[in-house]
Each structure stands twice: as C-alpha cells, then as structure tokens.
From Swiss-Prot:
Superkingdom as given in the UniProt entry: Eukaryota
Gene Ontology CC terms, in alphabetical order: Cajal body; mitochondrion; nucleolus; ribonucleoprotein complex
Gene Ontology molecular-function annotations: snoRNA binding
Native source organism of the sequence: Arabidopsis thaliana (Mouse-ear cress)
GO BP terms in the entry: polar nucleus fusion; pseudouridine synthesis; rRNA processing
Main function: Required for ribosome biogenesis. Part of a complex which catalyzes pseudouridylation of rRNA. This involves the isomerization of uridine such that the ribose is subsequently attached to C5, instead of the normal N1. Pseudouridine ('psi') residues may serve to stabilize the conformation of rRNAs.
Protein name from the UniProt record: H/ACA ribonucleoprotein complex subunit 3-like protein
Pfam families: Nop10p
SUPFAM superfamilies: Nop10-like SnoRNP
Keywords, comma-separated and alphabetical: Nucleus, Ribonucleoprotein, Ribosome biogenesis, rRNA processing
Subcellular locations according to the entry: Nucleus, Nucleolus
Family: Belongs to the NOP10 family.
Primary residence: nucleus
Length: 64
C-alpha cells in the first residue's frame, strides 16, 4: 500500500491509500519523484527553460 492523495471540493489535499477518490477520479502519489545526481536530461531542461524565459535569472529581481 502506497500513500496517495487527491484534492477535494474545498481545494484541500486529502491523503488516502485508495487508488480512486470518492468523486471517482484517480489519486496521485503523495511522494515526490526521486532525485538523481546523475541527471541525464539536465542540459535539455536548462535549454528549454532558457528558450521560454523560465530561468530565475530571466525574471524581474525580487523586491525585499
């Protein structure tokens, strides 16, 4: 049994072990994806973020 979660009508995250929410929708895993230091696709990910202006350095500076 793996921990699953879904978003209820109020927008709250609800944790369960069932594969389906009471509304009949599929639940998603409550655990984050594993991080691997041997990331094969990091170069492509950075290139895509640079192309679409999603890098943190391409945003306006934060106002503190």
């Amino acid at each position: 049994m793996y921990l699953q979660c879904y978003i209820n009508e109020k927008g709250e995250k609800v944790y369960t072990t069932k594969k389906e929410s009471p509304l009949g929708l599929a639940t998603e895993s409550a655990h984050p994806a594993r991080f691997s230091p041997d990331d094969k696709y990091s170069k492509q990910r950075v290139l895509l973020k640079k192309r679409f202006g999603l890098l943190p350095t391409q945003n306006a500076p934060l106002q503190y």
